[in-house]
């Protein structure tokens, strides 16, 4: 008999720092086993926030899929800022190059709703614009 899915959850943890807690307890999975597997799987991404989609089954087993670090976090790291602008229409908090945007877009491409790097760059540029980050060397589209 096939396992029945009881819940699907989208969570974010720091790489190698998942700990048993309320978020995992509500899923009804084997928390120590999840934290061990997650921490092992994220060894190479130390210091990054790692989104994860956890599928919990009725027999307390689970599967999980690691996603790429959120674009806003990658943009903040590239720009060297703590947070985005409180009013992005009037404030510019940092400037980054189009090359940095391309680098982020190439990394994020697997998780974005884009068919190519140029489309992914537009998505990342939109996130940057909403954070008050200006991009040099990239034409603006409205």
From Swiss-Prot:
One or more lysine residues are methylated. GO terms for molecular function: large ribosomal subunit rRNA binding; structural constituent of ribosome. One of its GO terms (cellular component) is cytosolic large ribosomal subunit. Part of the ribosomal stalk of the 50S ribosomal subunit. Interacts with L10 and the large rRNA to form the base of the stalk. L10 forms an elongated spine to which L12 dimers bind in a sequential fashion forming a multimeric L10(L12)X complex. Belongs to the universal ribosomal protein uL11 family. This is Large ribosomal subunit protein uL11. The gene is rplK. It comes from the Bacteria. CDD domains: Ribosomal_L11 (cd00349). GO terms for biological process: translation.
């Amino acid at each position: 008999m096939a396992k029945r899915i009881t819940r699907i959850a989208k969570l974010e943890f720091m790489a190698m720092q998942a700990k048993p807690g309320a978020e995992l307890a509500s899923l009804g999975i084997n928390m120590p086993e999840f934290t061990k597997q997650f921490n092992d799987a994220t060894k190479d991404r130390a210091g990054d926030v790692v989104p994860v989609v956890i599928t919990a089954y009725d027999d307390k087993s689970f599967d999980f899929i690691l996603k790429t670090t959120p674009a806003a976090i990658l943009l903040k790291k590239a720009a060297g800022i703590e947070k985005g602008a409180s009013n992005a229409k009037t404030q510019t908090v940092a400037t980054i190059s189009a090359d940095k945007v391309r680098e982020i877009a190439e990394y994020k491409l697997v998780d974005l709703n884009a068919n190519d790097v140029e489309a992914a760059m537009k998505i990342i540029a939109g996130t940057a614009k909403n954070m008050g980050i200006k991009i040099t060397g990239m034409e603006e589209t409205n």
